[in-house]
């Protein structure tokens, strides 16, 4: 019998970021805070939100949830390849060696590179399309929510539909960070993952 996936509407807070590494190779980890149907597709980009659109000069990847779906509290790690990032400049093709611990990943179709900056950056997660995104999570490790139009590759405003401290988080300008599980309540909620007080950091590889 042919398996036909039934797609549930994914919502803000159904995943949360729990780690990032901007020192090569780039890496980030999410946790599912709700069941994800198999075949669900999520974009991850390092493009900031200007208030009206994604910054055009940054790239991304498109992740597909594996057959059988993913239960709540599943961690998924994405690791860059090639020069350390996820997609190449200027074509936006997938770097050789990019991997994901569960599911599959392809280039997003954005003709730009996705490579995390050690000067601060952000990762936005959304469904829909690049032109019309529905945001579900964001980690900003540039120290503040801001958009000046200069050095825009490393800036973002709070994406629409998200609330800082609830389903997205702003963190210190550090190369690497992760949730400290010892600081989390049991059970942890999505807002616990998006509480900057529950994160630890370093600037080493």
Protein language model features and the residues they cover:
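A structural motif detector for short, solvent-exposed N-terminal "entry" segments of globular domains
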Residues: 6-48, 112-119
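Conserved beta-structured recognition patch
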Residues: 41, 109-205
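Short, basic/aromatic beta-hairpin or loop at an interaction surface
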Residues: 46-59
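Acidic, serine/proline-rich low-complexity intrinsically disordered regions
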Residues: 84-94, 103, 109, 115-117
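C-terminal segment of classical bacterial N-terminal signal peptides
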Residues: 1-5
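Intrinsically disordered, low-complexity Pro/Gly/Ser/Thr-rich segments with frequent PxxP/GP/PP motifs
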Residues: 60-88
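Acidic glycine-/aspartate-rich tracts in secreted/extracellular proteins
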Residues: 22-23, 32-38, 48-51, 81-85, ...
């Amino acid at each position: 019998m042919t398996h036909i996936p039934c797609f549930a509407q994914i919502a803000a807070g159904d995943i949360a970021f729990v780690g990032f590494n901007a020192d090569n190779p780039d890496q980030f980890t999410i946790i599912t805070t709700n069941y994800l149907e198999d075949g669900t597709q999520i974009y991850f980009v390092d493009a900031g939100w200007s208030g009206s659109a994604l910054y055009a000069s940054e790239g991304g990847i498109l992740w597909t949830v594996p057959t059988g779906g993913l239960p709540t509290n599943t961690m998924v790690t994405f690791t860059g390849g090639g020069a350390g990032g996820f997609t190449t400049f200027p074509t936006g093709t997938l770097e050789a060696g990019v991997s994901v611990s569960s599911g599959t990943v392809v280039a997003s179709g954005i003709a730009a590179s996705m490579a995390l900056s050690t000067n601060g950056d952000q990762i936005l997660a959304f469904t829909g399309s690049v032109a019309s995104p529905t945001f579900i999570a964001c980690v900003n490790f540039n120290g503040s929510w801001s958009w000046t139009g200069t050095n825009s590759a490393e800036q973002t405003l709070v994406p629409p539909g998200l609330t800082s401290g609830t389903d997205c988080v702003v963190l210190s300008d550090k190369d690497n960070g992760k949730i400290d599980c010892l600081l989390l309540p049991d059970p942890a909620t999505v807002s616990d993952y998006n509480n900057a007080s529950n994160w630890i950091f370093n600037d080493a590889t």
